[in-house]
């Protein structure tokens, strides 16, 4: 069953950007492993088969060890992932400075333009909590759409 991304897409991207903004600048090995698992689970969480395929492809090409090495790297990964999807859908590209400011992540124009890296303290339980919330939201949308 596929659910129209217009119903869940904005909340999904907002969640990913918030997760990255809350990630530690210098994450522990455990936090990096949890985040790697979270990123790899993203395609499975998506309620759209086409979106799942595209996410598997995009994530499969990423150097996840580098992506999870810092807040900046993780934030840039999700920022670039979001813009990659927007380009595929012929939607406007997000401006790096705007997105970084919105999520209160320090902005370095050079590094952001080069593509890849990014304030509250990250803890492993947050990934689990956000993943559960995302699954509940997606399941709720699917449940409601069946009864319309």
Curated annotation (Swiss-Prot):
Record function comment: FAD-dependent sulfhydryl oxidase that catalyzes disulfide bond formation.
Pfam families hit by this protein: Evr1_Alr
Membrane-crossing residue ranges in chain numbering: 122-142
Coiled coil: none
Lineage, opening ranks: Viruses, Varidnaviria, Bamfordvirae, Nucleocytoviricota, Megaviricetes
EC number: 1.8.3.2
Protein name: Putative FAD-linked sulfhydryl oxidase 096R
Reactions this protein catalyses: 2 R'C(R)SH + O2 = R'C(R)S-S(R)CR' + H2O2
Single annotated GO MF: flavin adenine dinucleotide binding
Family statement: Belongs to the IIV-6 347L family.
